[in-house]
Every structure is written in structure tokens, then in C-alpha cells.
Amino acid sequence: MSEKHPGPLVVEGKLTDAERMKLESNYLRGTIAEDLNDGLTGGFKGDNFLLIRFHGMYQQDDRDIRAERAAQKLEPRHAMLLRCRLPGGVITTTQWKAIDKFAADNTIYGSIRLTNRQTFQFHGILKKNVKPVHQMLHSVGLDALATANDMNRNVLCTSNPYESQLHAEAYEWAKKISEHLLPRTRAYAEIWLDQKKVATTDEEPILGQTYLPRKFKTTVVIPPQNDIDLHANDMNFVAIAENGKLVGFNLLVGGGLSIEHGNKKTYARTASEFGYLPLEHTLAVAEAVVTTQRDWGNRTDRKNAKTKYTLERVGVETFKAEVERRAGIKFEPIRPYEFTGRGDRIGWVKGIDDKWHLTLFIENGRILDYPGRPLKTGLLEIAKIHKGEFRITANQNLIVASVPEDQKARIEKLARDHGLMNAVTPQRENSMACVSFPTCPLAMAEAERFLPSFIDKVEGVMNKHGVSDEHIVTRVTGCPNGCGRAMLAEVGLVGKAPGRYNLHLGGNRSGTRIPRMYRENITESEILDSLDELVGRWAKEREAGEGFGDFTVRAGIIRPVLDPARDFWE
């Protein structure tokens, strides 16, 4: 990215109300404990509505029945979403059995939702069950700390499980980074786990008393797979190996996909290369990036507060030099690396130690017992006999990891009997959506509930043009916050209003290019008309091995986004 307009290191002005809230919260306590005992409302009041996010929860309501309840003079049907902290997506079968039971017994929807942040969410937790869910997680060695709001969120790690020593090492670093950047406040333990208050004063040596200016996302990625979509994240450690052993990381900083419709000060941005660092400097560098963003990030405008905007304001080289100063190192030149794809390899893959790994495609990541496809029961039955663990992928799928040869047939039979290994087209495997309606308060258009039937129609277009064995990375996100990562898709739909989307084209299969808006505020049938024409051209005019996104750029259908801060909206 360019250094054309270096600006002030710190943005002066009136701080946002979120900054006041954090400062007055007594290190994230607020009055959450008192609010839990208020039976007059199903929700949290005042600052607590936002403070619970630091504890891994969002307050939501069922938007399908919001108007009906308002007509009955009832408050919305409040319930919480809880997101678990699960670095690298690894979960034991003991933990899985516990979360399966909680979902069945204590949530409105009865489902487990795998997310593209490589963890799981519960939707529909009533207020009376909020404390029990944290205690259940703690009882099996899990927590929900720092999975939302202005902290370092769940750390992602490439999912190919244990195919080499490299993957095991990378996963350990994901855990170390996650632990190192956690908040130190005792508020979580006091409120949810009934741990006694201690006399010592809380301190936050890394995050600070007002935490970060905005959410912060971190990945550890092993080329050539970009399954974790590094360019959606603030801080990325790209594993560099010599003779199959991890020796260090390339650091890329300042990716992020969230925008606001019509606000040209917002844009999606790919991460910038800072340089290579040996392993021993990893935690110092991670801390230096976070504290630089802590001190320089914009606290006067939350829509301009993420690391990507800080980099553009102060300049990449200035930010990089400050990270070097704080970490006490000089970055070496970037080591060579490349990404060739980011999909999961569905089915069996053999790893090291003669163990096998079974990747199961879970459409939209929603684990529930559907008619004729009891996915949730199937995974529970596998968890009862599997001696290894599960891994959640950043594509919202699930890996049954480290299966011995003599257990393979039994686990495969359970998976097949419960609809977990039904045949899936390459197109469906490479499509993804965020949750959106009915639970997300930000949703503008359907996403998860829209995707399956939409992909049926896209597959019809692919069949018509003779490319049914191909795939186009397709993503639907219900609003411009971009949880569905549509801003790294070949075909990205961004919700604008019920039944209407902005259509973005020109991303690539490996997730290294931002797509540009092609048509604005259009219906499903208009989207399909565009795809019918363009897929037809792709089928006839493409070069050998050329993906749809690359074709749309080469053919001049869409101009590539080269410098997002300046050309994203052109």
C-alpha cells in the first residue's frame, strides 16, 4: 500500500462513547453481576449491553417475531449468542459432548453453529442460562473470554491436522499468541465462575485500561493453504519452514473486510507485508503490533478505528518501524511463500503416525438434526467412540482428527448413517454465509437461510454452461460488516435490504484480492442473470486453469482493486 498521505500518529478529538464505557467499567465488570439478577427484562441494560461482548456474548432477539411481540406490547424475545474461545479450532470429544448437551437442554434453537472464526457459537441462550453456560465451559477447560469486542479475538490456525510436525508447531503458536494477548482482568472469573475478589488492583499491561480501539483478529497460516483467509485479519503469521520444521514467520498486518454502505472512508483491505521474524521473537512482535494499534488507533470514530485505517493514516513504514522499536528487532526480508487455495479437502486424508483425518462438510456450519440428516446426533455418536479430537475449520466444516486405521470403518459408517458424508458438489463446498436473520441485529438481508437454495440455482447455471465440475468461491454476508468474508470471494453478495444485495466480482480462488462492486442493490434473479451471462463467457473464453475471478479481471469485466484506500469505491 502507498505512503502518499502520512497523517498524525494519534487522532485528536472527542472520544467515542465506547471509550467512556470501557474506562468506567472497572476493567469490564460494569454492573453485569447485578443485571443478571434483574428478572424484569430478558436482556442487559445500559453499558452492560455492550460490556457482555468482552465476555464473549452478544445480546440478540428473534427478528422473525419482533413486530408480533411489539404489537402484543411485549419486549423483544431477548437471548444471547455466546462464542467460545478455541484457538486453532481444536476441541476434545469430552468438550464436544458437553456443548452438545448444553445446546440441546439450554438454548432456544438447539443447534451448534460452527463459525468461520474456527470456533462454535450457541444461539438463543436465555438470561437465566448465561451464567450456567460459562460454568459449563469452564468445567471442561473452555471459556468465552475475548471472543468479541475490542480485544484480540479467537486466533485462527491452518486446519490440516497433524499432516506434519509443522502443523502441530503452528497450532502451539496459535495457542501461545492467544494466551499472551488475553485480558488480565479478573472480571470474567468473578462474575461467571464465582471466584473471590482479590485485593490486588487490576492491570492490563498489553491491552490497557480502555482495551483496543476496535476488534483485532490474528491468524497463523501454513502455505500453500490460505484456509483461514489471512487478508481478513489484522495480524498474520505466515509459517516458514526448512526441512519440514518451523523456523519463523512472515508477518502481514492490516487486513480487514468490514465496510459501511455509502461511507467512502471505509474499505476492505488486504494485509501489508512487514517482513520475516525468527520464532523466538513471535510473542514480542505480536505484543508490539497490538500495543502500537492500541496507542495509535482512532478512538474518535469506531468506523475508522481498525488497524487497516491506522496503517493508511500513519503509513506502513512508520507503523512497521514502531513495531520494530517496541519489539527490539529488525524484520528480515519477506521469505518466499505462495497460496494456491483455501478450501477444505472433504473426506479422508492420511496424516503422520498412520492416523487418518475425516473432513465433514457442514453446510453453513449449522449442526442440528434435520429430517433424514441427524447431523447433531451423528457427531455426538462419533464423539462417544472417537479417541482423538475434532477440529473446526475456518470454512465452517469439522474434521474428525487422528483416527486410527482400525476405527476408520466404524466412524465412516456413523458419519454416513447420519447424513454427514452425503455427496456435495465442488460449488457447494466452496460457498459460505454468515448467520444473518433471524438472530443478528445487524442483518439487512438473508444469508444462511438464503445460501442453500441460491447455490442450487448457481449450480443450475454451472450445469447449463458445462462447468459443473468447477467451482466459483461464493460468499453471502447479510450486512457490510462482512462476517461471511464476501470481500475475499470471486462472487461476493453483501446484504443491502431484504431480498437485495450488492454484487462484488473479481476476487480470486486463493483469497489474495479484494472484489469490486459490479452491481448495486439487486435481487436474486438479477444476480443470477448476471452470473448466467458471465459464467457462459468464462466457460467459452477462459484460459487453462483460469478461475472465474481471474477471468473477470483479465476479460475487463471488472477492474481489480489495487489500492483499496484510494480505489475501492471507484
Swiss-Prot record:
GO cellular component: sulfite reductase complex (NADPH)
Assembly and interaction partners: Alpha(8)-beta(8). The alpha component is a flavoprotein, the beta component is a hemoprotein.
E.C. number(s) listed in UniProt: 1.8.1.2
Coiled coil: none
Record has Heme as a keyword: yes
Name of protein: Sulfite reductase [NADPH] hemoprotein beta-component 1
Enzyme class: oxidoreductase
Reaction catalysis annotation: hydrogen sulfide + 3 NADP(+) + 3 H2O = sulfite + 3 NADPH + 4 H(+)
Gene: cysI1
Source organism (scientific name): Klebsiella pneumoniae (strain 342)
